[in-house]
């Protein structure tokens, strides 16, 4: 079972440490540091929900706006038993830098509700979503803060959020959230965007490092939206996906898993458990497999100082947010592992969310080929920007990405000044 936090360091401590490292490397002015290090707004809400039994259960919800100097706050909503305020603050912080790295006009936001959606009915999830949306309604809006899907939230949940907001306004407001169903103003290609963006950064890494995708041995930790799509695209490019895991099982086949069949099995059963033609292994064994590309696509702090030395790979592609702790970063640097940092690797999702927002605001929609072509251009350009800084400043890729993102946010704050 994968957990969100470890005893080593919580996600927000990781975010702050990585900020300080980048700010030091940039020699950032102390006044700018003070302006952009911490969240602008932090909201905690009580969310009472009438369950199917008639009992009223109270859930804890959060919405954090980290920085809006470059545009409206942007970031997903997650439903998970381990959601905490510190986790949401960390994710909002990373969203600020992520949007800046891919140079889209958004700031960083994030939200979540501490709940177990797997044990809730569709009706209970709808009630929870509408109550939570009503509670954070003063903070959100197409020009203020635009939520999106995240862990265990779906296009249907985004549709309920959009409807709740619209009912309060008295007219349809499609652009208040992204990741919606296409029938409600969602964008073609949005569902695959995070995994597709990850794939593009892996391609770019391979080109620069001389590691071709064809024949590369891949391990995927986390087989949700991002992990499964990345695995599918790599499999289509003739990589060999040796192993995959979700919250219930880790499986391995030395000759390569049949990814199309594995995706169908997961859709049918909700789990990787019981997939034929695969050996069950432990999560620890999965991370220690000899491979060329490791994709941590689950939750934060999956790879720490305790297990990083057991990892045997050439590339780590962070499809999840914050899966590698600073101590694990240092170990990977010692071992010569090339890491594609989360704020670059998984930025495909927010990039196509931006496309969706643009399409909703303009009432003009693009076909899927246009969406994917625009995404590839942005992800490739952004990778090249980070890789260039990595080489010029002789810093690791995470520090280079943070320097690029934080530098752009700092410049926006500097140009805007301080009001009043």
Whereabouts are the PLM-identified features?
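N-terminal ligand-binding/catalytic initiation module
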Residues: 1-188, 411
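Adenosine-phosphate binding glycine-rich loop
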Residues: 2-10, 205-206, 310-420
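Conserved active-site and cofactor/substrate-binding residues in soluble primary-metabolism enzymes
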Residues: 10, 14-17, 83-86, 120-131, ...
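Buried hydrophobic packing segments
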Residues: 88-91, 161, 198-206, 230, ...
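General beta-strand structural signal in soluble alpha/beta enzymes
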Residues: 90, 146-148, 171-177, 220, ...
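Glycine-rich phosphate/diphosphate-binding loop of Rossmann-like nucleotide-binding domains
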Residues: 181, 186-288
């Amino acid at each position: 079972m994968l957990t969100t936090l470890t005893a080593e360091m919580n996600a927000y401590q990781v975010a702050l440490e990585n900020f300080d490292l980048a700010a030091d490397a940039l020699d950032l002015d102390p006044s700018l540091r003070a302006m952009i290090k911490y969240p602008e707004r932090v909201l905690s809400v009580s969310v009472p929900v009438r369950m199917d039994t008639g009992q009223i259960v109270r859930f804890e919800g959060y919405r954090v706006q980290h920085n809006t100097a470059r545009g409206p706050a942007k970031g997903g909503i997650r439903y998970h038993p381990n959601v905490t305020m510190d986790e949401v603050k960390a994710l909002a912080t990373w969203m600020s830098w992520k949007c800046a790295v891919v140079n889209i006009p958004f700031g960083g936001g994030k939200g979540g509700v501490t709940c177990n959606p797997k044990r809730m009915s569709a009706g209970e999830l709808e009630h929870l979503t509408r109550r939570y949306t009503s509670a954070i309604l003063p903070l959100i809006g197409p020009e203020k803060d635009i939520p999106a899907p995240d862990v265990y939230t779906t296009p249907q949940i985004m549709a309920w959020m959009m409807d709740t907001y619209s009912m309060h306004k008295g007219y349809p407001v499609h652009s208040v959230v992204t990741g919606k169903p296409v029938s409600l103003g969602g964008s073609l290609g949005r569902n695959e965007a995070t995994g597709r963006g990850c794939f593009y950064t892996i391609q770019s890494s391979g080109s620069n490092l001389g590691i071709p995708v064809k024949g590369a041995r891949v391990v995927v930790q986390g087989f949700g939206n991002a992990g499964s799509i990345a695995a599918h695209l790599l499999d289509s490019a003739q990589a060999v996906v040796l192993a995959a895991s979700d919250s219930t099982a880790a499986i391995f086949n030395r000759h390569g898993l049949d990814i199309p069949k594995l995706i169908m099995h997961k859709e049918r059963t909700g789990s990787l458990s019981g997939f034929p033609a695969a050996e069950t292994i432990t999560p620890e064994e999965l991370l220690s497999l000899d491979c060329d590309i490791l994709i941590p696509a689950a939750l934060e702090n999956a790879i720490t100082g305790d297990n990083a030395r057991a990892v045997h790979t050439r590339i780590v592609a962070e499809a999840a947010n914050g899966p590698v702790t600073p101590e694990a970063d240092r170990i990977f640097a010692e071992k010569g592992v090339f890491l594609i940092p989360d704020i670059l690797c998984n930025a495909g999702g927010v990039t196509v969310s931006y496309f969706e927002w643009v399409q909703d605001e303009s009432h003009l929609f693009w076909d899927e080929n246009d969406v994917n072509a625009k995404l590839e251009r942005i992800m490739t350009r952004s990778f090249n920007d980070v890789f260039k800084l990595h080489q010029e400043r002789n810093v690791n890729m995470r520090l280079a990405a943070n320097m690029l993102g934080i530098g752009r946010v700092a410049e926006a704050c500097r140009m805007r000044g301080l009001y009043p």
